[in-house]
Structures are given as C-alpha cells and as structure tokens.
C-alpha cells in the first residue's frame, strides 16, 4: 500500500487498515489454498505436514489455534513419525484447533532450524484466513525436542503468540529476554537429568523471575519442576493449557525487548530493521507521547511502526534515542 496523501484521523486510519486487511486476507487465502488442502505447507524446499483435531463451537474468526511440536530429533524417520502421532494425543484444549505439525527434518534441532519460522508463519496465516482463527489466540507448545523448539521459537517469534509452553526440553543457546510480552510456561521433571534438562529449567525459572522483578509489566511465567518425575511427566504438564488460555496476544505492547539469535528476523511487534544481525538487541518503550529507544546494539537503522494503539497520533509525538531527541512534531 502507498502512503496516504494526507493525514488520517484515527477513525479513517482504522477503516483503511480494515480495508487493507480484507484485501490481504483474500490474497493469502488464495495463495495458501493448495497447501492448506494438502495439509502440507512449503517454503524454500522444506515441507511441514500437519494433522489436526477440533473442539468447541467458536465462531469463524474467534477460534483459537494450538500448535503442538512433537519430540524425537536425531532418532530416525520412523521414531519421529511415531512421536508426531503421539503428539496429536498428548493434549486436548477444550476449544480450538489443535495442530500437530511434522518437522521437515529428522535432526536433533528439527524445531529450531531457520526454515521453521517461515513455515510456522504460513501455517498460522492459513488457519487465520481459511479456518477462522483469531490471530490474538494462537498458542505454541512442545514436548522433548518440541520443547527445545519452544525454548528457541518463543523468544524469536513472541509477537505471533498469545502464550507458549515448554515441556521436557533443553534451551541450548536460547535466552528468555525476548519473552517480555509472551506468557511462558515450563514443565520439567525434577529427575529429567539427560542433557541437564532439570538444571536448565531451574536456571530459566530463576532468570524469568529476575526479569519479572526488574520489569513487572512483563515476563509473565509459570515454572513447574515436578518432583519425582523424569522425562515423562505422567500428564501433569497438561496443567499448562488452562493457564495459557487465559491470555491473548499483546500485539501493541508499550515496551519491547528484541534480541536476535542465530535465526534473525526483520520485524518484531512494531519494530523493524532492514537486515537482522546475530546478537542485535533493541529495547524501546512508549511513555505517554514519547517513544524512547533505551538500547540499540547491532542495529544501524530502526523503523518504528506506529499506531493509535500505542499513542495518540492526533497529537504531537517525540522520539528519543540515547537521551537525544530525534523527532518531535
């Protein structure tokens, strides 16, 4: 879409956004039709097959979507296929579309390679425009190797989800800083010693608690290290689902912490960059009519995508970076 030739009122801007969304949704529905009907999404030579279960009677546009990542990893195709089938039975939300995708590869890092992000974006878009999912009620969860994926995907794709839950996984090099606006649950058995999963979960629990103390408006979390449980938690991890469904996505948070890992992105909430870079870190907050960039490492140019959901665009605004006023008007 081209920029508006004149300034728009809030009502006119909302009307234009709705018109643009209707047009874009129609384009996406047509673009994704074949993949949706084949139950297999494709991108850059990779294929993400899906199976689903449905429950409840929410109206079109109000349905929730639960994306549940299976375990397995570098165990061979037959094992991963079995884990995929098992994942379809692990959880049953009372309402919504429960989708278990099959990882495109049979590697140890099958859920956090670079192609996964784009494939999940296609899956989410298809279920929004073709199956009536509410974009603010998309949830992510995963078990074992799927939990590894949630540790990684949660922080780097936080703006897509309402909440996420990690079960019995290992974070590898993931960090929780990007979870500022994504409620995050973790469930691990206290006796799940392989790869130090139990200790890693304790470490993440402490990190999330510290982040929550420093920033009480963010880092909502639930951490359960289950006594006497090993890698299999006897279904006690299902307690994550009613906790998750309390939340809706915060699409326009007043504070954003964006940390890029080895899979980079060009956008995150209402921030965008021309090119993502490993280790880049940006913190931006809105205070009244002031946009304040408090941290920007590894970023040459930063784009702020504004909305009346953040501040009153009918009034003057100010943008500050490192204590300097960059824009006022």
Regions found by a protein language model. Name each.
Residues 1-65, 325:
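A domain-start/cap signature at the N-terminus of enzymes
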Residues 193, 199-292, 296-299:
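C-terminal catalytic histidine-bearing segment of alpha/beta-hydrolase fold enzymes
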Residues 136-180:
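Primarily recognizes the serine-hydrolase "nucleophile elbow" in alpha/beta-hydrolase
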Residues 61-65, 94-98, 134-138, 157-163, ...:
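Loop/turn elements at helix/coil->beta-strand transitions in domains of secreted/extracellular proteins
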Residues 185-189:
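Short beta-strand/loop motif that positions the catalytic acidic residue
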Residues 62-130:
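Active-site machinery of serine-nucleophile hydrolases
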Residues 297-315:
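Surface-exposed beta-strand/loop patches in extracellular or lumenal glycoproteins
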Residues 72, 103-104, 190-193, 228-229:
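Acidic beta-to-alpha connecting loop that harbors the catalytic carboxylate
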